[in-house]
Amino acid sequence: MSDNMNIIDELQWRGLINQSTDLEALKEATQNPITLYCGFDPTGSSLHAGHLVPLIMLKRFQQFGHRPITLAGGATGMIGDPRDVGERSMLTEEQIGENMVAIKKQLEAFVDFTEDSDVDSPAVMVNNADWISQMNVIEYLRDVGKNFSLNTMLDRDTVKRRLESDGISYTEFSYMLLQANDYVHLHNEFDCVLQIGGGDQWGNIVSGVDLNRRVNGAKVHGLTVPLVTDAEGNKFGKSTGGGKLWLDPQLTSPYSWYQYFINAGDSVVIDYLRWFTFLSQEEIAELERKVAEEPFKREAQRVLAREMTTLVHGAAATEAVELAAQALFGKAELQDLDEPTLASALQETEVAEVGADATILDLLVESGLEKSKGAARRTVGEGGAYVNNQRIEDIEWSPSAEELLHGSWLVLRKGKKRFAGARVGASS
């Protein structure tokens, strides 16, 4: 990062600006420290990979001396931003409160809220329920609603799609007004002059910019980040099982998180390095050269996975998952893995539940590595069956208590690359 580089220059070379209001005016404003915000509705107990770019954007701005505000949508989260299909489930205040506590902890991995830290502009966390709950219906209609054209609101893509299908409730239809009012409140209270968000938030962001102009005569700004997809054009952040990739390690293990990024396609890995990491322009250019010249080494993917796991889960978790990956291929000792890391690594494969008297043939079949005992017998005879990285040559072999990892686990392998796991219980 150049000492003379403006944050907007940084975002531009990284390709992080999708849409924005007057970009030159924003660049001029960011010559001095500004306050910006991004909102996160606590509709779940964890943020997910789809939140990564806005989260990391807040961190980038803070590194350049600007003050980030993270807005927890305690009020808007009870309503829900309209989505393309169907109404959202309504959450209780208690659920929202519990989710906010969990999400605050995740936000701390990205921005520094500490007043006495070395950061010039410590982040602030606010809850829009604190001001929205104080507003009565008359104030809402008079001070907010009168500034919005129904024609403009109906023209929003999501609203149009909902009206053409199953309709939309007035509750969700009002979301845009409440979010716009958040921006007015934050401008008045914190002199906030920039809102950032995902591309799907552009309509809401522009509404807030316009409401500030109408109510305060203020010139504020808005910026959205690019839509992130995988190499096949699918929505970014879906795990191999099809579910979301969560920041909470109890929902998505650090091993699964690491594996998602190390499996990034060559066509997207450089974009991911620009968007998600804090590597310099020169470092990324060097990795881009290696992708072009030696893609089989997958060095860019390894760097990406390491950077992203360290950012979200910490350096110790990164070391553990890299050790697990090495151990599965016999390049490190399986006995050195703690049980949670071993278990999460094996959850990426089939895990068989077997009795203590299971033979190698039982293990190969029950784990799905072979379809029949006849095929399993051939694999053993050809020297292709491994348990805990040890070749098994006896078709009658059963594990001893000493061979069980953490008292119950076995790592099975057929050939060089096909893995499975087994949990051994009492004899059947």
UniProtKB/Swiss-Prot annotation:
HAMAP family cross-referenced by the UniProt entry: Tyr_tRNA_synth_type1
SUPFAM superfamilies cross-referenced by the UniProt entry: Alpha-L RNA-binding motif, Nucleotidylyl transferase
Sequence positions that bind ATP: K238
Chain span(s) of sequence motif 'KMSKS' region: 235-239
Cell location: Cytoplasm
Protein EC: 6.1.1.1
Biological role stated in the UniProt entry: Catalyzes the attachment of tyrosine to tRNA(Tyr) in a two-step reaction: tyrosine is first activated by ATP to form Tyr-AMP and then transferred to the acceptor end of tRNA(Tyr).
Disulfide bonds listed in the record: none
Gene Ontology cellular-component terms listed: cytosol
PANTHER family in alphabetical order: TYROSINE--TRNA LIGASE, MITOCHONDRIAL, TYROSYL-TRNA SYNTHETASE
Motif ('HIGH' region): 42-51
A GO biological-process term: tyrosyl-tRNA aminoacylation
Family matches, as PROSITE patterns: S4
Gene3D superfamilies: HUPs, RNA-binding S4 domain, Tyrosyl-Transfer RNA Synthetase
The keyword RNA-binding is assigned to this record: yes
NCBIfam families tied to this protein: tyrS
Keywords noted in UniProt: Aminoacyl-tRNA synthetase, ATP-binding, Cytoplasm, Ligase, Nucleotide-binding, Protein biosynthesis, RNA-binding
The protein's name: Tyrosine--tRNA ligase
Residue span, S4 RNA-binding domain: 358-415
GO terms for MF: ATP binding; RNA binding; tyrosine-tRNA ligase activity
Residues annotated for L-tyrosine binding in this entry: Y37, Y175, Q179
SUBUNIT field: Homodimer.
Keyword Aminoacyl-tRNA synthetase: yes
Catalytic activity: tRNA(Tyr) + L-tyrosine + ATP = L-tyrosyl-tRNA(Tyr) + AMP + diphosphate + H(+)
Recorded family membership: Belongs to the class-I aminoacyl-tRNA synthetase family. TyrS type 1 subfamily.
